[in-house]
Amino acid sequence: MALKSLAIVAAAILWAATAQAHSHKFKTLEIVHPWCIETEDAAKPVVVSMTIRNTGSKPDRLLRVSAPNTAKTELRAGGPPDAEGNAIASVPVERKSEVNLKRGGPYILLTGMKKPLGAYDSFPMTLTFERAGKIEVEVTVEETSALEPLKQ
């Protein structure tokens, strides 16, 4: 009995570590841990966060984002998700550097979700870059408790 409990705990820890550290590599770009927070209401805007690493010798730009489960996707300069006028045309990713897309900085905003997002769900998203082209990623939906408080 104790061995079975230990195996269950070990599997849960391994699953949690894997879920927290997933990444997608394509050419010179690595997309690290794309995630968002669960929602109870499909009408609520969703902020998607991730880190984009460019290991190449040339800069790139995130030009577009698409997801099949949403009516609209936007690249945002910052500010609250419900603010108007924060859309930007692209996010630069300089050579040999990384960009953190998250609340308080540039981020991805999804609106018009087809259904609420439950914790531990995931959904596909396509990121289109100027040089690297299209990169398919899987966005993990995390519990609300994963959201770090913003420093105002």
Feature-to-residue mapping (PLM):
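N-terminal signal peptide c-region/cleavage motif recognized by signal peptidases
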Residues: 16-18
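Compact, glycine-rich, soluble single-domain proteins
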Residues: 22-152
